[in-house]
């Protein structure tokens, strides 16, 4: 964080603008629910694909959602070196199709479990 602040200060000085940095929120990473991770893994594996786990400390909606209910995320492989939350973020149609199919499988399993 110190490196980012220092670079921002250099840029502001070079551009002759005033820079004010203020922390407005701090939240710990949201733990994913083990049962939901297992549901996602089963949905991905049902497509004949391996399921991988990925820790994420990013500021996703899950940081607040997990306070109200269990959560887990399905990450879709990204192009452009995996850049995320940026206009350069990109995914393939095939990977989006796989994500939708995994989601469909997960929701169908939930419906079956409830009936």
Regions found by a protein language model. Name each.
Residues 50-100:
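Zn-dependent metallopeptidase/amidohydrolase metal-coordination segment
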Residues 17-37, 56-63:
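A short beta-alpha structural unit
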Residues 13, 45, 66:
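Anion (oxyanion) recognition and catalysis
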Residues 42-49:
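Short, basic, glycine/proline-bearing loop/turn elements
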Residues 3-4, 36, 95, 99-102:
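Hydrophobic alpha-helical membrane-association signature
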Residues 10-23, 50-55, 112-115:
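Flexible, glycine/charged-enriched surface loops at secondary-structure junctions
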Residues 102-113:
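C-terminal alpha-helix
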Residues 1-9:
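Short amphipathic alpha-helices in soluble, non-transmembrane regions
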């Amino acid at each position: 964080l110190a490196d980012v602040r220092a670079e921002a200060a250099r840029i502001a000085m070079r551009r002759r603008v005033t820079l004010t940095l203020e922390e407005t929120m701090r939240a710990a990473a949201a733990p994913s629910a083990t049962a939901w991770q297992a549901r996602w893994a089963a949905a991905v594996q049902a497509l004949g694909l391996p399921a991988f786990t990925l820790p994420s400390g990013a500021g996703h909606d899950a940081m607040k959602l997990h306070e109200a209910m269990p959560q887990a995320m399905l990450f879709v492989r990204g192009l452009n070196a995996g850049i995320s939350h940026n206009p350069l973020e990109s995914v393939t149609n095939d990977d989006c199709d796989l994500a939708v199919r995994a989601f469909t499988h997960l929701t169908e399993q939930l419906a079956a479990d409830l009936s």
